[in-house]
């Protein structure tokens, strides 16, 4: 019997870059543009992803290493629960791109969470969002990934969340010393809170159709991070979380403007011409817009508190060559 699962995309509202430092927070939103996994038991292991042009088994393959490593960890997890292993055929589709251009919504975390969900569905296991997050993070840490894991949290929880990063180095060092179950049972020091916005408003995702900055540039931006940047960003991230929960429109706008300004000060590479246009489109409107993620391309986000201004914002984006990728109504209408 074939099981079908899926994982969403994600975007940062605030806290990108700062959240790379343990103890720093960020706010992320799940985006319902999906990758899909189909899985069934088979006579031998077979893995296929539409990102590649070939099918593999568990023989090491550079292109499939992320999926294969996830399968290996999940097999270890299943055996720790005294579950007999059986081979399967896993198919993954959904590139989160258009005309070969990536939206910037997915991540390695998307693939790992999808693979975990597929395997647990096949074996009839029900994992919590926290368990899924920890397993996916374990896979990535074991591979040497040094990301914040905020994307993994957002994808695992499938919600608007506040995420506070933990000491990944400490957990990574234990991977070679302690069994999987022991590490999963620990308190990692992660903070993940779901956010239910109170004030009704529109959330928009604008796609620049340009790639994000290169890994080398990202590393340059990281090297510029100061204690002042971290302190100020954390203050605004927490203000934004409270404002979203309380429906305080002006504070939402102020906080997003401030974190946007902090990113501009951090590196001019974050806001390219398209992202500058995306942000400027909110000027004079009851809206606020900023870049999302690494910057230099991909997507930006906007909040609009007026139906009329929402239409104007989207028209301005269109005029600047920015596509409206996604729109969602947040909050509780009175």
Model-derived features with residue positions:
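C-terminal nucleotide
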Residues: 2-14, 18-21, 28-84, 97-100, ...
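Hydrophobic alpha-helical hairpins/lids featuring a short glycine-rich hinge
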Residues: 90-94
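DPxDG-like acidic metal-binding loop motif
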Residues: 104-127, 159
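Short glycine/threonine-rich catalytic loop with a Thr-x-Gly-x-Asp
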Residues: 105-107, 289-296
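Short, charged, amphipathic alpha-helices and their helix-cap/turn boundaries
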Residues: 130-132
């Amino acid at each position: 019997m074939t099981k079908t699962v899926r994982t969403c995309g994600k975007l940062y509202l605030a806290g990108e870059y700062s959240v790379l430092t343990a103890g720093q927070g960020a706010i992320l939103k799940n985006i319902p543009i999906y990758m899909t996994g189909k899985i069934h038991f088979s006579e031998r292991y077979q893995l296929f992803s539409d990102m590649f042009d070939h099918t593999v088994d568990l023989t090491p393959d550079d292109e499939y290493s992320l999926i294969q490593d996830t399968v290996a960890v999940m097999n270890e997890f299943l055996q720790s629960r005294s579950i007999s292993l059986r081979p399967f055929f896993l198919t993954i589709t959904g590139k989160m791109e258009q005309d070969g251009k990536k939206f910037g919504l997915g991540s390695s975390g998307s693939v790992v969470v999808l693979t975990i969900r597929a395997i647990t569905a096949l074996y009839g296991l029900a994992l919590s969002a926290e368990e899924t997050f920890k397993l996916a993070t374990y896979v990535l840490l074991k591979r040497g990934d040094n990301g914040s894991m905020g994307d993994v949290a957002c994808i695992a929880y499938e919600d608007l969340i506040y995420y506070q990063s933990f000491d990944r180095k400490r957990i990574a060092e234990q991977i070679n010393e302690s069994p999987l179950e022991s590490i999963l049972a620990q308190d990692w020091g992660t903070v993940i809170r779901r956010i239910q916005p109170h004030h009704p408003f529109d959330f928009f995702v604008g796609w620049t159709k340009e790639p994000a900055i290169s890994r080398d540039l990202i590393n340059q931006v990281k090297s510029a991070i100061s204690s002042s940047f971290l302190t100020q960003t954390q203050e605004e991230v927490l203000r934004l979380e409270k404002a979203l929960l309380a429906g305080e429109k002006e504070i939402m706008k102020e906080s997003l403007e401030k974190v946007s300004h902090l990113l501009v000060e951090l590196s001019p590479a974050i806001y390219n011409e398209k992202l500058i246009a995306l942000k400027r489109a909110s000027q004079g409107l009851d809206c606020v817009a900023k870049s999302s993620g690494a910057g230099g391309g991909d997507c930006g986000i906007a909040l609009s508190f007026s139906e009329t201004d929402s239409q104007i914002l989207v028209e301005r984006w269109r005029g600047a060559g920015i596509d409206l990728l996604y729109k969602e109504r947040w909050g509780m209408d009175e």
